[in-house]
């Protein structure tokens, strides 16, 4: 049985909690894809991008306005340079935009777990220059969910932050399923090869970003989870500083299973059971 050090049930396992979602635009060889967390485009034109303040509990780490970049063949951008590099390398190997999205997303789940992860959900819009296809990969409520899920014993609504940080906010993830679906139709490189960048980073370690350090410092609830506390904070209880080498061999183990067995490895079997156990044994308010 694989042991899972999921950083945070409300962020890494499942993003069903009004967290900030990055709108993605991808283009490679005439194909545009709009999704979550990743941005690729073969740029002939770049429009203005507007952002809004993220809904709590994820704190803002501010934003910077910089001069845009242009490319004749393709370009890629993501919320973390390591994720961007992973997608870029896939494109250089002849991979499709969809291939690059998958590699980038797997790295984002490691280096930016507060905003992205295997347990999240996504919308994806695919445009090849002639037609548009939309894919719904958002989370769904657990089978046992009912209208009283977020009510207390007095039939009063639970406070938002209490609900979000509890096991009750966890839904059935959809991101991996939708990525598997679009890869089947539009992928070029083997599915297994797309997980190598994230597996290597999780095994060998990555440097904590300034954004992660800032958000860890602002998060008031992360230490409520012993596993998350051990992973994100040092022995004195302080968040890892920018530049700290952080490893996650458990995440690498999960990705290896998914790379070999597809999205079903997350939705059933030992990984799924580990998620269910985590949710149902959440310390303050267990979920379904």
Identify the function of each model-found stretch.
Residues 41-42:
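C-terminal motif of bacterial Sec signal peptides marking the signal peptidase cleavage site
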